Amino acid sequence: DGFECGGHPGEDDIPNFILLPRAADELTIPFVASGGMADGRSLVAALAMGAEGMNMGTRFIVTEEAPVHENVKQAILAASELDTRLVMRPLRNTERVLINPGVERLLEKEAALGSDIKFEDIAPEVAGVYPKIMKNGDMDAGAWSCGMVAGLIYDKPTVQELVDRIMSEADSLISERLKNFL
């Protein structure tokens, strides 16, 4: 995953504009781009950088069929690319999450404890919170993964509508906008 991703981006902070071409240079097997992917522009860019396709996490959460609480979908729709935070860095288990009161508590603990922090110190904000958030809609229960791509999510289509739109956008980009570069 590129640094933009929701969830665990690794510890080296490498965005997809660097990571994907490096992967294309180094790998001898097909790979998909992941992190910051939302639309036809993402797909065309991923293909141009050597990926065979793209993986979308945060974007697919905001679809009609996604089996998560409506509060999660609405929180992502209301968010911008500036509303995520990186947590658990001192533990070298960095996770990108959507800001909420539980995340603010976690960040306060990280700031106060610094390098002395232990998982047990933040367990209330991370351990077992996913069912509370994703199933019950308790948006302040703690940290939950969300990518910076939230800033590019404006609607809640069906999966079919989303995939069709992505393919149509990619086709238009390639056949109209990019044709003049050849």
Regions found by a protein language model. Give the residues of each.
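Conserved active-site-proximal phosphate/metal-binding subdomains
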Residues: 5-32, 38-182
